[in-house]
Amino acid sequence: MTILPISAFSDNYIWTFIDKIAGVLDCVDPGESAPIIRFAQSNQLTLRTILLTHHHYDHIGGVDSLIKQWPSCKVYGPIDERISNLTHPIKQGQSVQVGSLHFHILFNPGHTSTHISYYEPQQGWLFCGDTLFSAGCGRVFDGTIEELHESLLLFKKLPRNTKIFCAHEYTLQNLKFAHTVEPCNSSVINYMQQILKQPSPCTLPSNIDLELSINPFLRTDKEQVKQYALSHGANSSDSLDVFEVLRNQKNSFK
């Protein structure tokens, strides 16, 4: 089985698992249907499973058309009235079998109130939707900043070699903000230079080890990150206070 990012909209990735021997593919958060249909038809594949992380349209917008094309397709996602056509509503603590892959469901509210991620421990894969980005994290919509903070603390506990399959290509812009927070962080500087030199615009998947060195939202315990937050209105150097200031500053960062 191989993993391929199929581009959608301006910066979305629809992560796709391809099993050519079985003649099937599975995908995560298909915000658009056309790219998946084109790929499947050109490779003579049948869509078997859709995994959804949350209700935002750029993650679920293609589902209706895809299940019309493949009526037997299974659709997994969080229990949320804003998501229709789920064949398998799932909760935290449940698991999902997709071919040979066995995903653990992680409840990661914050970006939204019902956001989930799919973690495959044997492969070391994390499909985290909009909760964690490379060098960044999602905005808070109908979740809370406290929930988002806890969700990222959970990710910090995963094995360092865990690959992170984010849903958007935001890495370069996130690194610019990370450099503002930690201008002396050589890991941020070096990674930004590496990305600017590489021929492909795709910077994903990332991994936990890299993110712990470049992502300010995972580095709220670092002195320079604390000082940045305190200088921008943090009430204290506690992790949550630092995290909240970082998120607020990133919201308006150009």
Swiss-Prot record:
Zinc as UniProt keyword: yes
Entry GO MF terms: hydroxyacylglutathione hydrolase activity; metal ion binding
A Pfam family assignment: HAGH_C
Domain of life: Bacteria
Record-listed Zn(2+) 2 binding positions: 58-59, 130, 168
Keyword terms, alphabetized: Hydrolase, Metal-binding, Zinc
Catalytic reaction(s) noted: an S-(2-hydroxyacyl)glutathione + H2O = a 2-hydroxy carboxylate + glutathione + H(+)
Cofactor remark from the record: Binds 2 Zn(2+) ions per subunit.
Reported cofactor(s): Zn(2+)
SUPFAM superfamilies found in the cross-reference section: Metallo-hydrolase/oxidoreductase
Binding, Zn(2+) 1: 54, 56, 111, 130
GO biological process, one term: methylglyoxal catabolic process to D-lactate via S-lactoyl-glutathione
Pathway listed: Secondary metabolite metabolism; methylglyoxal degradation; (R)-lactate from methylglyoxal: step 2/2
NCBIfam families per the UniProt record, alphabetical: GSH_gloB (TIGR03413)
Assembly behavior: Monomer.
UniProt-listed HAMAP family: Glyoxalase_2
Sequence similarity: Belongs to the metallo-beta-lactamase superfamily. Glyoxalase II family.
Entry function: Thiolesterase that catalyzes the hydrolysis of S-D-lactoyl-glutathione to form glutathione and D-lactic acid.
Name used for this protein in its record: Hydroxyacylglutathione hydrolase
Source lineage: Bacteria, Pseudomonadati, Pseudomonadota, Gammaproteobacteria, Legionellales
